[in-house]
Amino acid sequence: MKLVFASNNKNKIAEIQSMLPESITILSLEDINCFEDIPETADTIEGNAILKADYVTQKYGYDCFADDTGLEVDAINGEPGVYSARYAGEQKNADDNMNKLLKALENNKNRSAQFKTVITLNLEGKQYIFTGIAKGEITETKTGTNGFGYDPIFKPENFDKTFAELPLEIKNTIGHRGKAVQQLIDLLTATK
């Protein structure tokens, strides 16, 4: 089965493809000649995932799935949330985003946070929504070189390492995206 993933983020595509059974092949937006930026104008993570999946299905006619992820930090009222990718500005720079977040939490003892991924799947005229959450805390410094985004400053519950220090296989099992993707896989393998 071939399925379009409404993303050109090569890190995300590789991470998700590594979790899928060999029978499911991901096509990127580039693979279907979609080079425009898909609007992410919703004010929720769920809303953005739906917007992206619907855009590809309606404009290009493909069954597809899309995701949106946000980091929600308790001490700053759930920020950066839906604005996680552009928290420090439209340039979407991960280091700038992490630095801004670390500055916002400076001298704050409450560092509780959660990553939330929502995947919307448009398949054969039906829409499915899957949510994965990984609870943890924001560290005081960046540690590790694996992963991307906020991974160097997010330490998942019951671990003494950040996502950026953990092997991809472990992150995929305990992480927000991995949990949502597993729900996607369960549905796709059940409907074959």
From Swiss-Prot:
A Pfam short name: Ham1p_like
Cofactor binding comment, as recorded: Binds 1 Mg(2+) ion per subunit.
GO BP terms, alphabetized: nucleotide metabolic process; purine nucleoside triphosphate catabolic process
EC number(s) reported in the record: 3.6.1.66
GO CC annotations on file: cytosol
Catalytic machinery residues: D68
Reactions that this protein is recorded to catalyse: XTP + H2O = XMP + diphosphate + H(+); dITP + H2O = dIMP + diphosphate + H(+); ITP + H2O = IMP + diphosphate + H(+)
Binding site for substrate: S7, N8, N9, K10, N11, K12, T69, F148, G149, Y150, D151, K171, H176, R177
Keyword set, alphabetical order: Hydrolase, Magnesium, Metal-binding, Nucleotide metabolism, Nucleotide-binding
Cofactor names: Mg(2+)
Top EC class for this record: hydrolase
UniProt entry tagged with the keyword Hydrolase: yes
Superkingdom per UniProt: Bacteria
Annotated positions binding Mg(2+): D68
Main function: Pyrophosphatase that catalyzes the hydrolysis of nucleoside triphosphates to their monophosphate derivatives, with a high preference for the non-canonical purine nucleotides XTP (xanthosine triphosphate), dITP (deoxyinosine triphosphate) and ITP. Seems to function as a house-cleaning enzyme that removes non-canonical purine nucleotides from the nucleotide pool, thus preventing their incorporation into DNA/RNA and avoiding chromosomal lesions.
Family: Belongs to the HAM1 NTPase family.
Subunit structure: Homodimer.
Record's protein name: dITP/XTP pyrophosphatase
Source species of the chain: Flavobacterium johnsoniae (strain ATCC 17061 / DSM 2064 / JCM 8514 / BCRC 14874 / CCUG 350202 / NBRC 14942 / NCIMB 11054 / UW101) (Cytophaga johnsonae)
